[in-house]
Amino acid sequence: MIIRSPEPEVKILVDRDPIKTSFEEWAKPGHFSRTIAKGPDTTTWIWNLHADAHDFDSHTSDLEEISRKVFSAHFGQLSIIFLWLSGMYFHGARFSNYEAWLSDPTHIGPSAQVVWPIVGQEILNGDVGGGFQGIQITSGFFQIWRASGITSELQLYCTGIGALVCAALMLFAGWFHYHKAAPKLAWFQDVESMLNHHLAGLLGLGSLSWAGHQVHVSLPINQFLNAGVDPKEIPLPHEYILNRDLLAQLYPSFAEGATPFFTLNWSKYSEFLTFRGGLDPVTGGLWLTDIAHHHLAIAILFLIAGHMYRTNWGIGHGIKDILEAHKGPFTGQGHKGLYEILTTSWHAQLSLNLAMLGSLTIIVAHHMYSMPPYPYLATDYATQLSLFTHHMWIGGFLIVGAAAHAAIFMVRDYDPTNRYNDLLDRVLRHRDAIISHLNWVCIFLGFHSFGLYIHNDTMSALGRPQDMFSDTAIQLQPVFAQWIQNTHALAPGVTAPGETASTSLTWGGGELVAVGGKVALLPIPLGTADFLVHHIHAFTIHVPVLILLKGVLFARSSRLIPDKANLGFRFPCDGPGRGGTCQVSAWDHVFLGLFWMYNAISVVIFHFSWKMQSDVWGSISDQGVVTHITGGNFAQSSITINGWLRDFLWAQASQVIQSYGSSLSAYGLFFLGAHFVWAFSLMFLFSGRGYWQELIESIVWAHNKLKVAPATQPRALSIVQGRAVGVTHYLLGGIATTWAFFLARIIAVG
């Protein structure tokens, strides 16, 4: 840490009334671009309008103006999020069986949507139990509401209205900070201030207030709910806050107030700030007292972190100093120059944030099932499967987005003249080594992982089970994974002596938590089948990385096209007369990377879905005998490609295929429709622009004959537009097909 004289204080950080509010301007399509504002000559105009509306770089080159637009757009985004949340809470208040579910969460399904009877649509309202007819929801909102202490639909109404007010506030803020008081560029670039406020404010105080809410409201209410008290009898949230005796009845140390805190006698608080590990056997969720303790600890950490960076007081860390001091023996100038990149290129900044947020989202997916945080979440199999699938897809998209914006940074913001021998320059200089090695890894992983399956299929077909790779023949046990599992299972007695159980039941240790006769979680065994599919995961992760990284590292130049930077981020080919230069733009790498991201995530969610149904989810008898949904068939069936097709895709598709005439029929229709959307994408991906232009001209001729030709000249989609439409429908169709397949299956059997 360096102590130096105070920084010169920045006085005026905003411009007043920089841009007048003009509805006339907003009403004019394409007002942000001289070309588009002229109006349409051809149908390409509408595509350009959509492509460039949010590409602020194309509106102006003034970084301050771009920053203000992005900042303002963030408020718009927050407004939409609040609106969405408000809708969710309103549905919970108006159309749901939340209060009934609260009284019996194990036998009543969550529902917050009732379909109107139009032409037989009432068939979609299934019986979710408790005399309620509706669509079973799988978002996990009911479980979150219970965990936060919501006991009535009135409280949901109030929260929904509160979210609407916040949405309006955000819309106002977006307008105000662009038109009335717009921050100067220096404000956006003041990273130390930003870090302090985000760390201490958002994460620190945010976690602290949540911990406070949990201790004062959630814990007592959940204590009553777990004991079977009728929600209408439970005191309201404000009563605990105003009346300490209510809390003291449940947690006696509350009677002492803050005395133990100031006398450092903190163990007094261990009644409601626990360190138990494992799951609450009543609800099948993490101990809420553990969660409160966790948020309090996180709050302390981030409140400290929010005081580490140097602002007006001349004390603390400076990010530029930290980055420039970051040199290794083999890294030349190290991180020198990165500070300038990250404060002048929002694409570079966004790229890092997307990569980290995407990875974090995937980590969330894995923790939601292994450490289910909310009461009765673990036994709601449809919600568990939905949450895992959702977070995996989102994570995949965010990571591809990271590569996209890294490439845009390379094309638009990277200045090679003042970058020499820093880390980025060194990576770019040995990009051939990186990409060729990565290519080798992909080929190795692809052939070997798939080869293991093909070997098994062949041996199985030839009737030689003793020669297959399986737990009963030639074993390929994941020994490292099993060692990690075992280490964690033993942790409570050894490395974490304060804990009573390990962080997750999945590690092992033999104990099982069941709620209402359903398995919440148990130790997950790993064997040869998992070893095989994990190598497919390794393969399908490395391929999109290869494609995307190649796109970033060769975004500005390559041996094939040395002046690629001049052609921009997206272009179809390097002009006429240069054959073999199509699909080389950075945009095309993102386009191709998306398909492999789709492959990668699909394998992960298939693996998860089948593994959980086979080895975890199921019912438990009074004698303690567990019957899994698919009876433990994963270990022997998933070791061949044929097994995946026959015992997973085909066997488990029976519910969605046979859903017609039942309350699940919407999933059957979606399954059909999404297949159609997916197939529709192939029309865009497999045909060229000229084919359609020819067809269009013949259709225009017919219109001219009938004197109904439009003034705007119809044009075929450009090559890039066609690919964009194609990949969108491919992903949308594929994801919606999987969604219908998963939900019809798990709602029927779960």
Curated annotation (Swiss-Prot):
Coiled-coil zones: none
GO molecular function annotation: 4 iron, 4 sulfur cluster binding; chlorophyll binding; electron transfer activity; magnesium ion binding; oxidoreductase activity
Chain sites annotated for binding [4Fe-4S] cluster: 573, 582
Bilayer-crossing regions: 70-93, 156-179, 195-219, 291-309, 346-369, 385-411, 433-455, 531-549, 589-610, 664-686, 724-744
Catalysis performed (reactions): reduced [plastocyanin] + hnu + oxidized [2Fe-2S]-[ferredoxin] = oxidized [plastocyanin] + reduced [2Fe-2S]-[ferredoxin]
UniProt binding sites for chlorophyll a': 675
Matching InterPro entries: PSI_PsaA, PSI_PsaA/B, PSI_PsaA/B_CS, PSI_PsaA/B_sf
Keyword Oxidoreductase on entry: yes
Residues given in the record as chlorophyll a binding sites: 683, 691
Membrane topology: Multi-pass membrane protein
Entry keyword Thylakoid: yes
GO cellular component, one term: chloroplast thylakoid membrane
Enzyme class, first EC level, given as a word: oxidoreductase
GO biological process: photosynthesis
Details of cofactor binding: P700 is a chlorophyll a/chlorophyll a' dimer, A0 is one or more chlorophyll a, A1 is one or both phylloquinones and FX is a shared 4Fe-4S iron-sulfur center.
Positions annotated to bind phylloquinone: 692
Purpose of the protein: PsaA and PsaB bind P700, the primary electron donor of photosystem I (PSI), as well as the electron acceptors A0, A1 and FX. PSI is a plastocyanin-ferredoxin oxidoreductase, converting photonic excitation into a charge separation, which transfers an electron from the donor P700 chlorophyll pair to the spectroscopically characterized acceptors A0, A1, FX, FA and FB in turn. Oxidized P700 is reduced on the lumenal side of the thylakoid membrane by plastocyanin.
NCBIfam families on file: psaA
PANTHER family: OUTER MEMBRANE PROTEIN, OMPA-RELATED, PHOTOSYSTEM I P700 CHLOROPHYLL A APOPROTEIN A1-RELATED
HAMAP family attached to this UniProt entry: PSI_PsaA (MF_00458)
Family: Belongs to the PsaA/PsaB family.
Descriptive protein name: Photosystem I P700 chlorophyll a apoprotein A1
Species whose genome carries this gene: Crucihimalaya wallichii (Rock-cress)
Upper classification of the organism: Eukaryota, Viridiplantae, Streptophyta, Embryophyta, Tracheophyta
Name of the gene: psaA
